[in-house]
Amino acid sequence: MKKKLKVLLTSAPTIDMEAFDKNINQIKGYVLYPPISLTTLAGSVLKKVDNVQIEILDLEFHIMKYFKENQESELEARVLMEKLIISKIDEFKPDVVGISVLFSRSHSNIFAIANIVKERNSSIQVVTGGNHATFAYKKILDECSNIDLVFLYEGDETFPKYLEYLKNNTKFEDLKGLAWRDKITRAPIISHHAPLIENLDPIPIPAWDLIPLKEYQKYGYY
């Protein structure tokens, strides 16, 4: 029996880790939304790809939860984020880490996550996607050598096909909606754009069972 392909999905926090205010987190709390982009993508993968195991690491949730429950902790948010990522990498041992980045203010956190993952295990494929990644793909590929691929526009169709490529060694040239680096020049290359999803009905229900959904209002607000 083939080994399951392990996929870890996470998102680049919108909060600046250097400016994270523990008092605000404790008294008022930060905005904390359940990561529907990650759960929807996970649902698509589980429906379309066989023999795959997915876990979600919502960094904002775990950071806010930790500081709510450990008021006297002197740990910095940036250090906690690194510890959370390393712990999950060591425990789950993913083959692929997908980083969702919806907003431009998360830009620096993409690099932080990618660097932590690759330093822990350089064989892991680190990919990113989302609104910001789509429009800043060149900047991302130019500035962070630890990002292997950028998914452009919606990944609900492209990401499952990419995982099939990794599992079954299908033709990389057949994949659409990706940006990567030329092996020689290192210049960004874009494949043909994947068609936009017009009919949303076939998109699976988000995989809410992969996150502690009921706890989100306890540690933040939305």
Language-model segments: residues:
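Radical SAM [4Fe-4S] cluster-binding motif and immediate context
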Residues: 33, 201-222
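Active-site/binding-pocket entry motifs
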Residues: 15-16, 62, 196-197, 209-212
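Short glycine-rich His-centered loop
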Residues: 4-32
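Glycine-rich beta-alpha loop elements in corrinoid/cobalamin-binding modules
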Residues: 37, 44-48, 53-197
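Short boundary motifs at domain starts and secondary-structure transition points
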Residues: 1-2, 88
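Short, basic and Ser/Thr-rich N-terminal targeting/leader segments
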Residues: 3, 32, 39, 172-174
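Short aromatic-enriched loop/helix-cap "lid" or pocket-rim segments at secondary-structure transitions
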Residues: 19-22, 140, 193, 203
